Amino acid sequence: MAKKARRPAKTRIEDVAKVAGVSLATVSRVATGSDRVSPALRGRVLKAASELNFELNGKGKAKIIAFILANRDVFNPFHAAVLVGAEAYCASRDCGLLFLSMHYGSNVPWQNLHLPAILERPSPIGAVILAGKNSQNLLDLFTDKGISFVVMGNNVVGNWRQEEYSALQFDDIEGAYDATRYLHSLGHCDIWYVGNCQMPWFERRYDGYCRAMREMGLPPLLNDFESEGEDLGYLATKSILKTGASVTAICAGDDMAARGVYKAIHEAGHLIPQDISVVGFNDTEAASLNPPLTSVRVFTEQIGRGMAALAFERISRPDLQPEVITIPTQLVRRESCRPLLHLETAPLEARVSAK
């Protein structure tokens, strides 16, 4: 039986770069119509593309941004709100927005990572918004492929070269600082922080909490659990209450953890805020908790619009210098906190038994 002829390998943008003797970024700039390429280099790229019968489809790239949610559930309320903001900006600029989800390990070499098929070159995608939980290896992969991207700076885990990338972030350190100062202004001194400091966002918020506690002359009280979401808050709070430690207020690292804090406090027979005041972070769960949760509001839709604006700008100018934008947060006060009377200085168990 005659062997079937092997199909020729598909030409990739890497082949164009190799034949032209230029970088992937240079080929990408030519493809997107950037004016930051010398005529000589542009000619070499176009000649190589013609020889390889490779279409540099710059037109299509100018109108589509990919929103990639990495290593997060697609129903995550925080990132869903960021997506809404990105959609609003893209609609205002007559730009398409494509939602993609991917999961990858932070320890996988970037050469072994696989992008969603539509991002393999040639692609109509002009730039990418990286939301969810990301790490340096994916940033290296996008850089190697010459794909312009903007990353949410708060959610990059591990060591990363922040100065090399365009990013939008919110000031979670200052947000946690404000929340802790607020609790102290109500008379609280036994203020615990609940979070998983293996994650950079929890660690930064702990830094803000610690700064406030030091300024007030109080020792930081940390219960650090390697968990996520509601389980994190629930297990950490159960542990605190089990020890009999004095606690009048808890700063939860995010609202999902705060939901677990509520559950543990209620199971132990205590009341919020009569026995323990609670503050969350992100302001995504307030309406579904009873009493409504005091939380640090992150302007998620503004973040989405800002990331989309940065990405849109880099479609036509992929060689722009990295830019980092920081958005402030806002403490939203609700019914989960109350002033602590100066006479209420006994440990929690003693206060409850005296009722």
Task: Report each predicted region and the residues it spans.
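N-terminal helix-turn-helix DNA-binding module of bacterial transcription factors
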Residues: 1-61, 354-355
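Alpha-helical recognition/docking segments in bacterial nutrient-uptake
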Residues: 1-8, 64-181, 241-242
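Residue-level detector of anion-binding/catalytic polar loops
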Residues: 23, 55, 91-96, 148, ...
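Flexible loop/turn connectors
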Residues: 6, 220-221, 236-355
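Hinge/beta->alpha junction and helix N-cap segments in small-molecule ligand-binding domains
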Residues: 70-81, 99-111, 154, 167-178, ...
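Periplasmic-binding protein-like
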Residues: 67, 121-131, 190-195, 223-224, ...
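Alpha-helical structural signal in soluble globular domains
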Residues: 48, 85-89, 141, 204-216, ...
